[in-house]
Amino acid sequence: MGDYAVGKTCIIRRYVSDSFSEDYKASIGVDITSQQLQFELHEVQLQIWDMSGQTDFRQVRTQFMSGTDCAILVFDLTRPSSLENISSWINEIYATTPNIPLVLVGNKADLINERKVDSEAVKRIVEEFRMFFYIETSAKSGSNVTPLFQDVAQKLMSDISPD
């Protein structure tokens, strides 16, 4: 989840089909995809929900959040307002699924010269909301996209008790 145009759909497309498009098309509602990955000796199926970042779709988003195992929150490293809005996204998530594990993703890491987000502000949010972890990605180059989803799967699997 996150503001519009932060790269949520691009991250998912990069992970699922190893593709990237420069053309921005706003997501409408919710798009669901799944991806299998090998985790230790287990095959894990991730069901990934791409939810529109536009306020018009808030009610749709909340209908789909129940039963979610983890929320990935994405902001744009070149747009400080998208980081500032993360707490609003967390409040929306917690209204439906309190205490869900959260992951914070700073996207567009390839735009090094355009970066405007302060790393201390990121650190404060990670600590305040006790995020699973924070990672910077580039959907355009593919940097850290696969590790993002692998790390989510690993954290979720390690939290499952063996009984």
Region locations from a protein language model:
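TRAFAC-class small GTPase G-domain
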Residues: M1-D163
